[in-house]
Design a protein with these regions (language model features):
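Buried, small/hydrophobic-residue-enriched core segments of structured protein domains
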Residues: 1-104, 108-109, 139, 170-174
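Gly/Ser/Thr/Ala-enriched C-terminal appendages of enzymes
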Residues: 73, 96-119, 124-209
């Protein structure tokens, strides 16, 4: 059913070494959380800008895939303007409606005058082969699509997979948080900080045009 598909690598570096396949991956949520929120001088609503800026300074023009949903994709797109949209080869979906997200990113590239076919949309949220194929059929003629499928492939037993997510909750003695595109997936030990971060994002979305 998937004859035109191929495995290009794994994010598990041990398996990549063992089976001599390419290690692949993207930046982590923790990178954006700590770079943007682990400094008291930074407005946390600009976390993506600080993280993207530091990433580009380190890697130049070989920047790979950017992660969009650390403090919501809408806030990410405020910072993912022409320079970063050009320098990064694509973006990764990890929460929220993947079909709505894909349409939003294609529209974003087009608004910047960038041909979406030159960019990659990497989907990685709770995928199986059938869902990945539906996404592929939806977007394949407009953009390059790729998929990160973990639990469905790795949990090949009859047992229900455990839902284990590990995220940073503090950096440099400061609270940090992830506010994704899926309501209720916030991750932080300090509810007051989550409220503060949410208000910062809301203010920016309303005032930063």
């Amino acid at each position: 059913d998937y004859q035109d598909s191929a495995c290009i690598g794994t994010s598990n570096v041990y398996l990549a070494k063992k089976w001599n396949v390419t290690p692949v991956g993207t930046m982590a949520h923790e990178w954006i959380m700590c770079t943007g929120q682990g400094n008291h001088k930074h407005n946390p609503a600009y976390s993506n800008w600080y993280a993207l800026d530091a990433w580009v300074k380190e890697y130049g023009v070989l920047n790979g895939i950017a992660l969009t949903d650390t403090i919501t994709t809408d806030c990410f797109l405020k910072d993912f303007q022409l320079t970063y949209s050009t320098l990064f080869s694509g973006v990764r979906h990890d929460s929220g409606d993947p079909f709505a997200w894909g349409e939003k990113l294609i529209a974003h590239y087009e608004a910047l005058g960038i041909d979406p076919k030159r960019k990659t949309l990497l989907f990685s949220d709770s995928l199986d082969f059938a869902r990945a194929d539906k996404l592929r059929k939806t977007f394949k003629d407009r953009v390059t699509v790729a998929f990160g499928i973990g639990t469905y492939i790795a949990n090949d037993t009859c047992e229900e997979p455990l839902n284990i997510v590990m995220k940073t909750t503090a950096c440099n003695g400061m609270d940090v948080a992830k506010i994704s595109d899926t309501p209720g997936k916030e991750m932080c030990k300090n509810e007051e900080y989550v409220d503060y971060l949410t208000r910062c994002i809301k203010w920016r979305m309303e005032h930063d045009r």
